Amino acid sequence: VASPSELDPFAGLPDAERLRRVPLLAGALEAAPLSGGITNRNYKVTLAAGPLVVRVYEHESSALAINRENEHLNSVAAAESGAGASVIEYLPVENMLIVGWIEGRTFSEADVRIPENLPRIADACRVLHAGPRFVNDFNMFA
């Protein structure tokens, strides 16, 4: 007999109800929280077609005053540049942004200090800045 979590990959997740309401995520095989995210709860959701990242946010939790519509449009621009994950779906009513999964890991401060990593970082910045202009400038101190 299968356990509830085997039948429902969202069982036990803080955003389970919200995740279950998204048609794209129906038939998910696995769902697991991802670390990080200052203003989001992030999940790796694996579908038959492959993994996605679901970013869930609360409007009132955004201490950085992030405009989520701008974040969506800027994510599209980053994807178009080739520096960001593809944007799969933006669901403002559910407070979600769903993007493609990129295999890898986030660099730590220590990783950035390794000289051999600097060309990769510079290349990623070059690709991003050569792409479409973001719809706004973000300054968390403004």
Regions found by a protein language model. Name each.
Residues 32-141:
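ATP-binding pocket architecture of kinase catalytic cores
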